[in-house]
Amino acid sequence: MSAGQRPAPKFPLRLDQVKPAGRSGAAPLLRPQRPLHQAATERGRGTTPAGLGLDSHLVRERMLARLQAEGVRDARVLAAMRAVPRHSFVDTALANQAYEDTSLPIGLGQTISKPSVVARMIELMLALQPAGARPRLLEIGSGCGYQAAVLAQLARQVVSIERLRPLYDKARENLAPLNFGNLRLVYGDGRIGHAPNAPYDGIIAAAGGEDIPQPWIDQLGPGGRLVAPMLDARSGGQVLVVIDRHADGNLVRSLHEAVRFVPLKSGTD
C-alpha cells in the first residue's frame, strides 16, 4: 500500500465506508445484434396495444428523447432501449403507460423499473467497457424480463436470476418470442449470484439490501463493475453503489444518487 492510501474496507460493504462520486462518461454506439423491435412485432404477443398510437416506435422515441434530456448519453444504452418493446413486458391494462418514466407493478409486490433508472444503471455499469466490447453480464432480479432484454442487446452473454417462481415464468414467457441466444434465465437465490458462469464484466442488481453480498464481489472479474442499490442507514433510503475491480484485483467503491428498489431477499419462493 502506497503512502497516503487508506486501507480498503472489508465486506460486507456498508455506506459509511463509501465516498460519493460523479457521473461517468458516455461511450460510442454499439449496434444491437438484431432488429429486436421487428422480431417483437412479428413474433411477439400480438399488435400494439390500443392507445399507444399508430406506431409504438414513435412513443419509444419520445421516451428516448426524455432520457437524453435527463442526461443519458451512452449511445449503446439508447440503442438497446430503442430496440426493446417495453409494452410487451407489462400487463395489457398498463401498456398505455409503458413508455412513461414510471415504475409499474408486475405482481407479487414487484415492479418494472423506471426507464430512466434502467438507463442510468446500465450506463454506469458499461462506463468501463471500451467501444465495441461485448461483456459478460449478471443481472440480479429478472422481474418481468425487460432489463434482461436490454442487456442482451449489449452483451456477449447475460445471466439473469429470479428468486420468485411466478416472475421467473413470466420473464421466460415475455422473452421467448425474442429468441435471444445469449440470455440465460436462472431460477435461484440472487444473493449468491451464479458462479458457474463467472467471472462477469458487469453485475447489476434490481433489489437492495443492507450490504453488498460477498458472492457478487467474488464473481466480478478484473476490469468489471458492479452497480446495485443499497440501504443508507443515515437516511433510511437507498442509494446506488458502484464497485470497480481493477486489473490488479483492487476494489474501488463509490456512492451515487438516491434510488428506490424492492428489498433484496434470500432464498426462493
UniProtKB/Swiss-Prot annotation:
GO terms for molecular function: protein-L-isoaspartate (D-aspartate) O-methyltransferase activity. The active site is at residue 113. InterPro entries: PCMT (IPR000682), SAM-dependent_MTases_sf (IPR029063). It is found in: Cytoplasm. Residues 1-53 are annotated as: Disordered. It comes from the Bacteria. Keywords: Cytoplasm, Methyltransferase, S-adenosyl-L-methionine, Transferase. Its EC number is 2.1.1.77. GO terms for cellular component: cytoplasm. It is an enzyme of class 2 (transferase). GO terms for biological process: methylation; protein modification process; protein repair. It catalyses: [protein]-L-isoaspartate + S-adenosyl-L-methionine = [protein]-L-isoaspartate alpha-methyl ester + S-adenosyl-L-homocysteine. Catalyzes the methyl esterification of L-isoaspartyl residues in peptides and proteins that result from spontaneous decomposition of normal L-aspartyl and L-asparaginyl residues. It plays a role in the repair and/or degradation of damaged proteins. HAMAP family: PIMT (MF_00090). PANTHER family: PROTEIN-L-ISOASPARTATE O-METHYLTRANSFERASE, PROTEIN-L-ISOASPARTATE(D-ASPARTATE) O-METHYLTRANSFERASE. Belongs to the methyltransferase superfamily. L-isoaspartyl/D-aspartyl protein methyltransferase family. NCBIfam families: pimt, PRK00312.1. This is Protein-L-isoaspartate O-methyltransferase. It comes from Methylibium petroleiphilum (strain ATCC BAA-1232 / LMG 22953 / PM1).
